[in-house]
Design a protein with these regions (language model features):
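A short alpha-helix capping/helix-coil boundary motif
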Residues: 50-51, 71, 115-116
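ALDH superfamily catalytic-core signature
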Residues: 1-68
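General structural feature for long, well-ordered alpha-helical segments within catalytic domains
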Residues: 2-5, 23, 27-35, 66-69, ...
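C-terminal core of ALDH-fold dehydrogenases
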Residues: 75-188
Length: 188
């Protein structure tokens, strides 16, 4: 299963990136042995993409000492797709901060997620999951920020705002919260 699901991402193109991370030497060895046999059932072009990715610097199998090392790699790598193949995949989710899409268990291959399951396929790539989310409804909604201070709030914030504005060289900003504002109010 791990070998099949690793190939899903590696066949996209020779610029793809995919890693199988495991704490099990047996899983790593079985996947490494199985992957070439699956290439025989792919078009020559897709098999070559997969071969290039999995034998280059942007893909492969990583054997880690413990799951903490796996979490660290995942959160640093920030994958576009993360499939967790374990007996209890849900228990790992709380440790993942940076992944665009997380698929849980052996019955949730990326193929199904891409074509049928429903999660958005417009996902942050190349580590962008560290700071971005998948495309969603909020990307198409327009919002306005609204702020309002009362006189006391203005007085509380004015002097600090004036300091920041002066430091940044924005005299108009500083004047709008300083003595000129008080003077202008008196002329109203």
């Amino acid at each position: 299963i791990a070998a099949l699901d690793t190939i899903i991402e590696s066949e996209h193109g020779d610029d793809s990136s995919v890693f199988l991370i495991t704490t099990s030497r047996e899983v790593a060895e079985k996947a490494q042995a199985a992957i070439p046999s699956y290439w025989a059932d792919m078009s020559p072009e897709r098999a070559e993409y997969s071969r290039a990715v999995l034998s280059g610097m942007s893909g492969g199998i990583i054997l880690v000492r413990d799951v903490a090392k796996a979490y660290a790699f995942i959160n640093d790598y920030a994958p576009e797709h993360l499939q967790i193949l374990s007996k209890e995949p849900e228990r790992h989710v709380e440790h993942i901060r940076n992944a665009s899409e997380i698929l849980l268990g052996e019955d949730t291959p990326g193929s199904i997620a891409n074509y049928m399951m429903g999660p958005n396929c417009v996902l942050p790539t190349s580590g962008a999951a560290k700071t971005r989310s998948p495309l969603g409804v909020m990307n198409f909604l327009k919002a306005c920020s609204i702020g309002e201070l009362n006189r006391l709030g203005l007085q509380e914030m004015a002097s600090r705002t004036e300091i920041f504005a002066t430091y940044e060289g924005f005299d108009g900003h500083a004047n709008a919260v300083g003595p000129l504002r008080v003077q202008a109010r008196g002329n109203e």
